[in-house]
């Protein structure tokens, strides 16, 4: 089964029963092996309405590549312009503020799932800003299924819970197996590839995967008892933790898997 077996419409809105998440993203993610998303704003609350699709994609040995912009404060921009601090550190810290706020609201099961996706390379995140410290504001999504068919969507929706089901947002969808739409899909794929690989001359991207993993593990550690992990200790995945995660993945993301967090350096 692939995208052609789905009743994919030309557009979706974020309201009602047939909203972006329920009627479009979850069904397509379940058939996908690659999900590429670039947005001006990302919140980890987005995982709530599409979690079933993400788990199915992971079972397909799929990958998610996410590019988003940080919400830079006036102080952040001034610090960058005046050279008070390393540009990458300021941008990463700004992105982390929103990232941590969002993931801290997730329950332990979803938080561990997110940690698993990042640790195993299923989910990779990069931060994008313009060379003048402006935000990257394009909103593009690309999905590829197991037979190579591609669906592209674009529109006003950011990658957030509000963007997918609370605000009034609209996306438009094009399909690679429709002759009149195939050329525009190739253009969007090239656009995303340049962004992801850092060859877009107007946008600078920074890796965030390791920072994301560290922030998630720190939150998990903070939720454990004092005897298991102290809140201020640096947290890293040990070999046996990687093995535990791998076993959980191999079991189809089922079962209660307690991931022990060591306070020791590896």
Report residues per predicted region.
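Walker A/P-loop
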Residues: 39, 252-266
């Amino acid at each position: 089964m692939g995208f052609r077996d789905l009743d994919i419409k030309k557009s979706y809105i974020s309201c009602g029963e047939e909203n972006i998440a329920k009627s479009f993203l979850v069904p397509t993610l379940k058939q996908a092996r690659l999900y590429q998303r670039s947005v001006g704003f990302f919140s980890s609350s987005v995982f709530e309405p599409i979690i079933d699709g993400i788990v199915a994609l992971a079972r397909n040995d799929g990958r998610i590549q996410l590019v988003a912009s940080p919400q830079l404060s006036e102080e952040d921009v001034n610090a960058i312009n005046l050279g008070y601090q390393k540009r990458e550190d300021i941008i990463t810290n700004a992105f982390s503020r929103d990232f941590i706020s969002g993931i801290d609201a997730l329950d332990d099961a979803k938080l561990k799932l997110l940690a698993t996706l990042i640790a195993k390379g299923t989910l990779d995140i990069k931060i994008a800003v313009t060379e003048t410290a402006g935000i990257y504001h394009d909103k593009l999504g690309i999905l590829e299924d197991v037979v190579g068919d591609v669906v592209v969507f674009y529109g006003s929706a950011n990658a957030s819970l509000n963007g997918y089901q609370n605000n009034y947002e609209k996306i438009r969808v094009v399909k690679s197996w429709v002759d009149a739409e195939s050329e525009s899909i190739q253009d969007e794929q090239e656009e995303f590839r340049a962004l992801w690989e850092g060859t877009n001359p107007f946008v600078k991207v920074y890796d965030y995967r390791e920072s994301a993993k560290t922030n998630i593990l720190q939150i998990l550690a903070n939720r454990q008892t004092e005897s298991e992990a102290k809140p201020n200790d640096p947290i890293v995945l040990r070999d046996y933790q990687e093995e535990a995660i791998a076993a959980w993945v191999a079991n189809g993301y089922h079962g209660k898997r307690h991931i022990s967090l060591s306070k020791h350096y590896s």
